[in-house]
């Protein structure tokens, strides 16, 4: 059909075949080159991944080594601190053991001395008894001789003669009896005084108050005189609002840069003081702000009262205490007696009573508890009728306190006789705290009244010539009439004055009564 040149066709076919083969070869080589490139890239990627893995492993290794070193350092530090604490504990235990050993040695030495003293005293008593027996025998012999003599030479009956002889014998040995009584009384007083001094000195060495208790401050300082006008407010509305909310009178007078707060309740006075201080510092003073600040101050005071009571309970270690009693203790931080802070005084009495109890083998914790609560009635004595003693007894009875605590409260001012050793110790600790120099201040009027009363009591006793109160009322020196009072009467006068002072006066500590009998003979040489 078609006229095709055979050689040309063959040539064309060969060209096509050759081209196809060439294209296939070119494609093959291109594919091989691409494959090699892919392998090379994959190899490079693998090498990069391996290198990154090595770097990450190396970094992780370094971090783990660092953390391990830090943990080792921390453990070593904790171990060193633990060793240090254990060493300190061991040192403290050794120190306590040494102190305990020293105390036991001192106690042993004291007991040895006391035993020697008791043996000597017993020996003296035996000697005195033998002397008295001898004197008694002599007196009996003398009486018999006198009876026989009088019966033979007198018409007196036996009974009349005996009465006459006994009167003579009484007169002859009265001086000896008085001397014996005086010696024994002085000896007993000396032993009791030395023992009491030792116990009290040990107790006071183990506890001493840090500072003299402060007075309650009722003066608020203000920056300038203009602030007084702002406190008063327009038509006095600010000061009226503050007085109505706090129950305290504000006295704004000519005192420079100061406002005086006057109120019977110390807690209210402290609330007013804090509120006024905040208002003065803030500068915004108006009825709304005053109400807000007073409420804030009242909340702060309530919190402070609770914390103060809890701190007192914790410090004295008296055990579990009812929350209401804790609050009453906290209120006493704003109460003062003769300038002495009542809460600090109660803490001081608690420690002193505890130390005294420990020295004589009584319950130390119970003594501290009684000492801490002994003035609890002063927390509300301005709100409730009655003395702080009766209020305290009622409160402690209501909260089921131990009978020793109630007894200590009832008797620490001598209103009733103490029924337990704890009550006696609390009264002694109370007197120690009150009599400590600087603990209390006393007005001049009451001081002079006490000295005058002391001299009047002494002068009222029969046979007294003059009496002088000396040593700030700690001693009364009495001069007696020598013609009316003999040596035996000195003891009776001293005892009478002592009993009257104890019955009629209230005083801290003790009062020494010294009675002096002096007889003078004078003449004039011409």
From Swiss-Prot:
Residues 216-279 form the KH domain. Its EC number is 3.1.-.-. It is found in: Cell membrane. GO terms for biological process: mRNA catabolic process. GO terms for cellular component: plasma membrane. Gene3D superfamilies: Hypothetical protein af1432, K Homology domain, type 1. Keywords: Cell membrane, Endonuclease, Hydrolase, Membrane, Nuclease, RNA-binding, Transmembrane, Transmembrane helix. One of its GO terms (molecular function) is RNA binding. It comes from the Bacteria. Disulfide bonds: none annotated. Residues 342-435 form the HD domain. It is a single-pass membrane protein. SUPFAM superfamilies: Eukaryotic type KH-domain (KH-domain type I), HD-domain/PDEase-like. The chain crosses the membrane at residues 10-30. It is an enzyme of class 3 (hydrolase). InterPro entries: HD/PDEase_dom (IPR003607), HD_domain (IPR006674), HDIG_dom (IPR006675), KH_dom (IPR004087), KH_dom_type_1 (IPR004088), KH_dom_type_1_sf (IPR036612), Ribonuclease_Y (IPR017705), RNase_Y_N (IPR022711). Endoribonuclease that initiates mRNA decay. NCBIfam families: HDIG, RNase_Y. Belongs to the RNase Y family. This is Ribonuclease Y. The lineage of its organism: Bacteria, Bacillati, Mycoplasmatota, Mollicutes, Acholeplasmatales.
């Amino acid at each position: 059909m078609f006229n095709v040149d055979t050689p040309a066709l063959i040539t064309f076919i060969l060209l096509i075949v050759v081209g196809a083969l060439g294209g296939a070869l070119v494609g093959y080589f291109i594919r091989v080159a691409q494959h090699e490139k892919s392998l090379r890239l994959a190899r490079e990627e693998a090498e990069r991944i391996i290198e990154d893995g090595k770097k990450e492993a190396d970094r992780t290794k370094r971090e783990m080594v660092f953390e391990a070193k830090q943990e080792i350092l921390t453990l070593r530090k904790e171990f060193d601190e633990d060793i240090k604490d254990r060493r300190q504990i061991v040192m403290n235990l050794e120190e306590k053991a040494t102190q305990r050993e020293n105390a036991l040695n001192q106690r042993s030495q004291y007991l040895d001395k006391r035993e020697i003293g008791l043996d000597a005293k017993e020996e003296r008593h035996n000697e005195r008894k033998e002397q008295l027996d001898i004197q008694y025998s002599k007196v009996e012999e003398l009486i018999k001789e006198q009876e026989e003599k009088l019966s033979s030479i007198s018409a007196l009956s036996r009974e009349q003669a005996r009465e006459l002889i006994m009167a003579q014998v009484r007169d002859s040995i009265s001086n000896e009896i008085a001397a014996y009584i005086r010696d024994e009384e002085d000896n007993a007083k000396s032993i009791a005084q030395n023992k009491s001094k030792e116990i009290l000195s040990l107790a006071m060495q183990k506890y001493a108050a840090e500072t003299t208790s402060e007075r309650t401050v009722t003066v608020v300082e203000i920056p300038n005189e203009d602030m007084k006008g702002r406190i008063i407010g327009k038509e006095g509305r600010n000061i009226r609002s503050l007085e109505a909310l706090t129950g305290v009178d504000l006295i704004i007078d000519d005192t420079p840069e100061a406002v005086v707060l006057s109120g019977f309740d110390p807690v209210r006075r402290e609330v007013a003081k804090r509120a006024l201080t905040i208002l003065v510092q803030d500068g915004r003073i108006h009825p709304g702000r005053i109400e807000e600040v007073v409420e804030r101050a009242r909340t702060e005071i309530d919190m402070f009262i609770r914390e103060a009571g809890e701190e007192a309970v914790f410090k004295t270690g008296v055990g579990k205490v009812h929350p209401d009693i804790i609050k009453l203790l906290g209120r006493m931080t704003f109460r003062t007696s003769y300038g002495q802070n009542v809460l600090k005084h109660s803490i001081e009495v608690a420690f002193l009573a505890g130390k005294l109890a420990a020295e004589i083998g009584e319950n130390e914790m119970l003594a501290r508890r009684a000492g801490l609560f002994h003035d609890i009635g002063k927390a509300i004595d301005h709100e409730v009728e009655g003395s702080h003693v009766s209020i305290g007894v009622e409160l402690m009875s209501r909260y089921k306190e131990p009978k020793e605590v109630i007894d200590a409260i009832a008797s620490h001012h001598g209103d009733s006789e103490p029924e337990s050793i704890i009550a006696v110790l609390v009264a002694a600790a109370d007197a120690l705290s009150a009599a400590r120099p600087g603990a209390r201040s006393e007005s001049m009027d009451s001081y002079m009244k006490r000295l005058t009363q002391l001299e009047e009591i002494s002068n009222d006793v029969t046979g007294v010539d003059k009496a002088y109160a000396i040593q700030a009322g700690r001693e009364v020196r009495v001069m007696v009439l020598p013609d009316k009072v003999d040596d035996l009467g000195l003891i009776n006068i001293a005892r009478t004055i002592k009993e009257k002072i104890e019955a009629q006066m209230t005083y801290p500590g003790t009062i020494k009564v010294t009675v002096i009998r002096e007889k003078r003979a004078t003449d004039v040489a011409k």
